[in-house]
């Protein structure tokens, strides 16, 4: 596995191990309808939440360094992706109205960036079926996330996790096909 692909896969592993630890420590988050960020507002889950998300951001930065300079769009996207994740971690929505606004702005920008990058990857891969399928799953989960933002009860966490799973799978699998075999 080439280094950029390995780094992005490690970022996904960090994200999901962190989320798994959060769910084990506080399973109520599955039904709270506050999304992934629910776990950033409790003392007992903040550390695995932060490690998971910041691990994903860190390995995205490592992937940037390992990508060829020719991969301008991917490098730029990851340069935006990593700080948005950091922004989500450092702006807990429960810390006041302005923090909530900042948190929501970072999260919305992240989802938008991920959808745009997914579309670009589909185009680069010439609309191969699995990339299009993962993009549609991501889009459907993004729509579900938007629907579940305001209700008291819903599946915001589950929709966000599905969105991130589809995006992460698309990103990692795409690099397998797009990067030259001799990549550093």
Which sequence ranges carry the predicted segments?
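Membrane-interface helix-boundary motifs at transmembrane edges
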Residues: 1-6, 64-76, 122-131, 179-184
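N-terminal topogenic module of multi-pass integral membrane proteins
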Residues: 1-68
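Hydrophobic cores of alpha-helical transmembrane segments in multi-pass inner/ER membrane proteins
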Residues: 13-19, 48-62, 110-121, 163-178
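Aromatic-anchored segments of alpha-helical transmembrane domains
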Residues: 19-23, 81-90, 137-148
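Juxtamembrane "helix-exit" motif on the non-cytosolic side of transmembrane helices
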Residues: 24, 28, 67, 90-98, ...
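Non-cytosolic membrane-interface motifs at loop->transmembrane helix junctions
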Residues: 37-41, 97-110, 154-163
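Membrane-proximal helix-loop-helix units in multi-pass membrane proteins
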Residues: 78-132
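Terminal transmembrane helical module of multi-pass membrane proteins
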Residues: 125-184
């Amino acid at each position: 596995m080439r280094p950029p692909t390995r780094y992005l896969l490690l970022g996904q592993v960090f994200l999901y191990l962190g989320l798994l630890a959060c769910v084990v420590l506080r399973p109520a988050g599955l039904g709270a309808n506050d999304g992934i960020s629910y776990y950033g507002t409790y003392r007992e889950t903040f550390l695995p939440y932060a490690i998971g998300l910041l691990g994903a951001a860190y390995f995205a930065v490592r992937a940037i360094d390992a990508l060829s300079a020719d991969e301008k769009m991917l490098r730029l996207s990851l340069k935006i992706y990593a700080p948005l994740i950091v922004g989500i971690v450092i702006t807990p929505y429960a810390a006041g109205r302005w923090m909530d606004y900042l948190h929501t702005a970072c999260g919305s920008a992240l989802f938008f960036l991920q959808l745009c990058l997914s579309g670009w990857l589909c185009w680069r891969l010439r609309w191969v079926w699995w990339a299009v399928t993962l993009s549609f799953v991501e889009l459907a989960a993004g729509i579900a996330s938007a629907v579940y933002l305001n209700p008291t009860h819903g599946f915001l966490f589950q929709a966000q996790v599905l969105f991130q799973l589809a995006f992460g799978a698309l990103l990692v699998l795409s690099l397998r096909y797009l990067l030259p075999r001799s990549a550093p």
